[in-house]
Every structure is written in C-alpha cells, then in structure tokens.
Amino acid sequence: MTSKEDGKAAPGEERRRSPLDHLPPPANSNKPLTPFSIEDILNKPSVRRSYSLCGAAHLLAAADKHAPGGLPLAGRALLSQTSPLCALEELASKTFKGLEVSVLQAAEGRDGMTIFGQRQTPKKRRKSRTAFTNHQIYELEKRFLYQKYLSPADRDQIAQQLGLTNAQVITWFQNRRAKLKRDLEEMKADVESAKKLGPSGQMDIVALAELEQNSEASGGGGGGGGGGCGRAKSRPGSPALPPGAPQAPGGGPLQLSPASPLTDQRASSQDCSEDEEDEEIDVDD
C-alpha cells in the first residue's frame, strides 16, 4: 500500500522532499525496516507467536491440573519459551490465588489471624485470688478493729509477721474497708425503712421476731393439740403483748383490760372447750 501511494504522489511533492530521503540505508543495519501502518503492526509474526504461545501455556497449565502425571518434555519446553507477558500474567494469577486462600483461612480462623493480618489479642488472664489462712484472717481482723489505714512501717511489720507480701496486705485492707462501707450503707437503709414504718410497725416486727423465737424454743407449741385449739383466736385491733410486759405499781400482776391478749386467750380456750363439747362424732353402724 505504501508503494502505490508513493507512485501516485504528485511531482511537486517529490521536489519538496529533502535530499536526505534519497540516501540509502546504512550498510551495517541487518534488520529490515518496519512499516508503521496498522495492518503491518497487527500482522507481525512475533505478536502472533506470543499470543499463540500464551494460549498454549494456559492450555498446558489447565491440563497439568487435571492430568495425573507430569507434563512431557515438549510441553515444558514450550512453557519455558513463553513471552514475558504470559509469565507476568501467570505470576499475577498465582499471587491473587494465594491471597484468596489466605483470606479464606483467616475467615475460618485456621491460623488465628484476622482478615487484615493482625493477630487476635489473647484475653487477659485473671489473677488467682490469694487464699488466706484462718490465723492470718484473725490477725488482720484484729488489727483492722483499731486501725483502718496502715502506714508503710505497719504494713511491712504485718506482712513479715504473717508471711504475706505488701501487696497482699494492701489488697486485704482495701477490700475490708469496701466491705465495711457496704455494711454501713445497708444499716442506714434498714434504719430509714424502719423509720418510715412508724412505731406500730416496729412493734409488730419485734413481736413477730419474739414469737418466732418462742416457737423455735418450745418445739412447735405443744404440737397444736385439741384439734387446732392450740392456736389463739386473735381479734382485730388487739395489739400483741411482748413477754417483758410492765407490772402494776404495787408489784402485783397488771390488771388487763377486756381487750387484752390474755383475756382473748382465755376466751379462745373457753370457745375451744365449748366447740369440743358441742362437736358430734359420726359412728358407722
């Protein structure tokens, strides 16, 4: 194509060309001149050969994966003669495959690595608690009664005396002060709740506590004999009288009002006896 276009060129254009264009090529150049048209560049045998070799390399690589045996010598020689472009492509594919495998292993947690390649920080192991002996606890409690805070000299003395370290003594006193603070807060809360109940509620609580103690001491109150008459019938509005009730000024027993608990107990015993007398027993013939 270039020769025909040059033949058809006008004679004026031939005159405009410089005399350097008519010079022959140098004698020492053995390589032929390469035409710069698109068709000539695409039709170069070296490019075709590189593409064909690249395709053959891919085919041989696929056959190597599926075939049980190794490649023949001819195939290996063909792979060794591939172009640098094919070698670069093969290297990149292997690199990406390796990255995919490492990411999958990290996701599965095989080697303890995260996806970003950072090792998971191990959990901080909790220190074991020091087991104090009874003698050590007794000495520490005795010292804590009159000294809540220790000086460095006292701390060293106690640690040497009980066979403990300074850190153990410091930790024990810190925990003991915290426990004392919690106990005081609980006591304050109990006092506040008792104040809210009022005097009647406090008397009821005291009476219930004394009744529980008496029932535990007497072993259940005589077994509740008489078919349930051992339980006194309480009337509404009659306050319970504690055991340490006040006596009369003369030293004799205190005169109880008709609504007192003792009169209620006597009345309940009479009611129980009347119920027992009036109770009928059915006997089968």
Swiss-Prot record:
Cited Pfam families: Homeodomain
GO BP annotations, alphabetical order: cell population proliferation; glutamatergic neuron differentiation; heart looping; muscle organ development; negative regulation of cell population proliferation; negative regulation of glutamatergic neuron differentiation; neuron fate commitment; neuron fate determination
DNA-binding region (UniProt annotation): 125-184
Region listing for Disordered, in residue ranges: 1-36, 212-285
Membrane as UniProt keyword: no
Tagged with keyword Transcription regulation: yes
Compositional bias ranges of the Acidic residues kind: 272-285
InterPro entries: HD, Homeobox_CS, Homeodomain-like_sf, HTH_motif, LBX_TF
Location in the cell: Nucleus
Assembly and interaction partners: Interacts with SKOR1 which acts as a transcriptional corepressor.
Protein name in the entry: Transcription factor LBX1
Chain's gene name: Lbx1
